[in-house]
């Protein structure tokens, strides 16, 4: 995580991050579903199991997991507010392919918005040549590497919650478990389990 203590306006042109795992490492990557507008999607896709050196060059959203042998590393974010989420791209260059590097990518800041009346939804019509703006001092998102020796430790890892900003809505006792829409999707990526999924 990084932070700024400037008093005025800050324009963030870009952020650079590259994570080297090794080309033969296996990863689980959820790719964008709209390659022509990769940042405009619903974040709904299955996880593709792939070696890093044969992974698609499409952008993948988080969380993403890499099997490093004795442990798995899941890349996550926390405390993400007024800043674009991090995406990952494999094989951006031959050097990245040889070293098994996942490189960060960020959506550009919207310049002009438009509206789909039939869906009651706005969308980005054009973008700026930077990724974010900010005023005054602030913290930026945490980049998290959750390291687990066993898959069963993944859902119990609470780093995202531990690093998040405190609750801003107050009393949450009114939030109750309930029914969910699209329930037929619940067995999409449960594989290799000893029970019938869904």
Task: State where each predicted segment sits.
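Short, cationic low-complexity segments
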Residues: 165-177
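Structural preference for beta-strand elements that scaffold enzyme active sites
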Residues: 139-143, 177-183
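Glycan-processing catalytic domains of CAZymes
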Residues: 179-198
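N-terminal accessory beta-strand-rich subdomains and adjacent acidic, glycine-rich linkers
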Residues: 1-168
């Amino acid at each position: 995580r990084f932070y700024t203590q400037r008093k005025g306006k800050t324009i963030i042109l870009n952020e650079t991050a590259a994570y080297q795992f090794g080309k033969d490492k296996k990863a689980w990557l959820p790719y964008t579903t709209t390659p022509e507008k990769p940042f405009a999607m619903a974040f709904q896709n299955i996880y593709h199991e792939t070696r890093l050196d044969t992974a698609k060059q499409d952008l993948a959203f988080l969380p993403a997991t890499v099997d490093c042998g004795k442990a798995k590393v899941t890349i996550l974010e926390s405390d993400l507010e007024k800043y674009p989420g991090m995406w990952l791209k494999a094989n951006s260059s031959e050097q990245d392919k040889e070293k098994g590097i996942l490189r960060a990518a960020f959506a550009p800041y919207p310049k002009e918005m438009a509206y789909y009346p039939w869906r009651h939804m706005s969308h980005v019509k054009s973008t700026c040549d930077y990724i974010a703006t900010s005023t005054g001092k602030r913290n930026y998102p945490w980049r998290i590497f959750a390291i687990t020796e066993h898959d069963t430790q993944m859902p119990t890892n609470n780093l995202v919650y531990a690093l998040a900003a405190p609750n801003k809505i107050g009393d949450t006792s009114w939030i109750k478990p309930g029914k969910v829409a699209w329930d037929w999707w619940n067995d999409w990526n449960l594989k290799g389990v000893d029970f019938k999924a869904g």
